Amino acid sequence: MKMSNKKVRSSGSKGIAFKIILLVLSSVLFWLSNPNIIFEDGIGWLAFLNYLPLLFLIKKSRFSETVIFGAVYGVLSYALYGYWLNTFHPLGLIIVCIGYLIICSLLFTVLKWADVISSRNSWLLQFLIICGYEYLKTLGFFGINYGVSAYTQWKNIYLIQICSLGGIFALNYIVIFPSAFLFSLISKKNERNRLLNHVDNARKSSISAYVKKEKALSDTSLKLTFICGALWLALFTASYIYGISVMGKSNSSRFVTIAAIQNNESPWKNGIEEYSRNVNKLIQLTEEAQSLSNEIDFVVWPETAVAPSIIYNYDYGTDMRRFLLISQLLNFIDENNAVFVIGNSHETELKNAGRTRYNSALVFESGKNVHPPEPGIYSKIKLVPFTENFPWKHTFPYLYMKLLNGDNHMWEQGDEYTVFDYRGLKFSTPICFEDTFTTICRRMVLNGSRCFINLSNDSWSKSKACQKQHLAMAVFRSVENGVPSVRSTASGVTCVINPNGKIIKAAPEFCEAYVIGRVPVIEDGYQTLYTRTGDIAGTLAAGLSALILIIQTIVVIIIKTRK
């Protein structure tokens, strides 16, 4: 009896250890497949296996265990992936980890429930659930696109062209499916061998053994698995062929030349001396770029490159040093032939409301809107949760003060998807991580934009992995909508991206630099299929998986009730 108990305990310990190995392996695959501290570009092909150990973990775990494993997976995966958040504020990383602790606990629970109610081909339902989860996690106030599987393929230039048809979440089907396919193949083969061995070892009549063997073969049939695998292979091949066929095709015969400036400045430095030094550095880098080319049509400065509000300090400011700095800047712009796109902390003053501050892009053109400053303005719409926007500041005032991190207030939210039209180029200016959101950039293109000029500041992260993660997502906005992108960042990554998502030119990280590139002027009438239809692939995965779950649950309840 004692020996039996020891064997049970030993078996249980081995089982837990194996589950922990599967859990850690899942998190490590997720981490390594994305840009990370070891591999700056990520190991993209690992993403095709990301969910394989996770599905085995779900299969081998009890319901109570899945909740715990899901929580640990969420914390471990996003702590490894987003470690750079700690540089901004430790609270930022803690909030993300807590968020994914809850989200992944729910995900694992739903995946386990799918395994229970759909035992024969639960892998297909689980595949849809995972695709739906990766779409749903990008929505709402807490929604972020960081960690979506398909973004790992950002260097796979031919494969990602399929996004012009179905978007990032269509590519997600292709990337996630191999994990589900291999899980089905391995688990069904193992289960078949187990059942057949059990039948052979049991003392049954030949007829009974035959019936049981047939049932075992039926329950573990791989027919559907191979059919789905063949369909995936056909889709994968077709996507590559499509990608090869569209590469190099151009929808434009006209170009403009854009200089994107990278000033490599820390966002934490404040004070008029620091502001003046930074503006002078930006002017110097601009002059250096223009000395190399007299054909520059646009000059782009990064997010909040000019910290003092240009319009407010010119019209209402009482600080003479700030006024003189703004006047110096405006004089430089007015004497310049290029259109300037400048990141600015834009302030307005409303009656009975005081001053409000926006994270904005201001567009100036010499002789038209410089003196007095009346630039075109776009104010950031999607603010970073908890760091730029916290809607519960009156409910949780202590947490709000901690999140301010030494600042005195957060940004106000913009409300207009502005499209600028200068020198024949219609463009929009998604700010910071706005170019990671499919819906924002698609809305801009539907409004008439034919180029994204992104203003960012990832220098605070002090992490190349963070900057590459951001760049990886920006690449897809060009592919999805068939328009070029220009990114001007304080650091990470300043570059020019063509409509196929190919990075034409890029500046090295963490240094003062600039990139000069020719950008095609896309025709007004041109829209990709994705631009016209949106994230149908993501909505379909979420809706279909929810519908099947509900139907299967009802069927299980009915069957149990009848018994």
Regions found by a protein language model. Give the residues of each.
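Membrane-embedded alpha-helical bundles of multi-pass enzymes
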Residues: K2-V246, S463, A474, T489, ...
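Short, conserved active-site loops that position catalytic residues or coordinate cofactors/metal ions
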Residues: I38-P53, Q262-N263, E295-D315, S449, ...
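Active-site catalytic loop in hydrolytic enzyme cores
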Residues: L85-L91, L136-I168, G354-T438
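Short, solvent-exposed loop/turn segments at secondary-structure junctions
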Residues: T87, P308-S309, E349-L350, W460-S463
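CN hydrolase (nitrilase-like) catalytic-core segments centered on the catalytic cysteine
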Residues: F127-L128, V306, T318-F340, T395, ...
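Soluble catalytic regions of membrane-associated enzymes that act on cell-envelope
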Residues: Y242-P385, F420-R423, T429, F433-D435
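C-terminal luminal/periplasmic domains and tails of membrane-associated envelope-modifying transferases
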Residues: N294-E295, N389, P484
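Short beta-strand scaffold segments in enzyme catalytic cores
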Residues: N359-V363, T418, G492-I497, V515-G517
